[in-house]
Amino acid sequence: PMHEAFLRLEVEGFLQLYPRRGALIVPISPQEIHEVYEARLLVDRHCAEKICAMPDAERADIADQLDATIAEQDTALDGADLHAYTHLDARFHQIIMDGGANSLLAGLGHQLRERQQRFTATAIGRNVARARTFVDQHRTLADALRTGDLDAYLSTLDTHLTNSRNQL
């Protein structure tokens, strides 16, 4: 099982394996960061377009799920539990990816989030205030999806991803 895990990590670009010598964690390049954020923007935009085109009741259901996740994020941050916050952040974005009604894009979105977490995990560090800024942006994103305001969503998403990238 360990060998298979290492092979998977190598295929995903996280490790470089050296037979009979060991493994090396592949450093994160500026190009990888750029490509992950660019791909996230494309996938997220597509999902938001699909959600904003849905009937009000369907959009409201997705927004309700997002609001519930935001409430959990607030609770986690009130307790300075950044580990829980990180998982809830992933859930928030996955709800949007799943709402795009394309399982391939939702899977790609999940993979991109995992790659992004590789370089953002240390960026938030122990900074609850920084995490609260992201939660405030989540509120704006959820509100834009609830009302079907794609322009507001995309503007906030651009700020959200730019702020995340600038933390690196």
Q: Which sequence ranges carry the predicted segments?
A:
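Hydrophobic alpha-helical segments typical of transmembrane helices
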Residues: P1, E32, F92, R130, ...
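Short linear motifs at protein or domain termini
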Residues: P1-A53, L104, R165-N166
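Mobile beta-alpha loop/short-helix "lid" or hinge segments that flank ligand
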Residues: V11-Q16, H110-R115, A129-R132
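Short, flexible turn/loop "capping" segments at secondary-structure junctions
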Residues: L17-Y18, D89, T133-F134
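Short alpha-helical transmembrane interface motifs in multi-pass membrane proteins
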Residues: S29-P30, A121-I124
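Conserved amphipathic alpha-helical segments that form helical-bundle/coiled-coil interaction surfaces
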Residues: V36, E58-A121, D136-T140, A152-T162
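Short, charged helix-to-loop "capping" segments that act as catalytic/coupling loops
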Residues: I51-Q65, G125-A129
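Short acidic-aromatic low-complexity motifs
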Residues: L145-G148
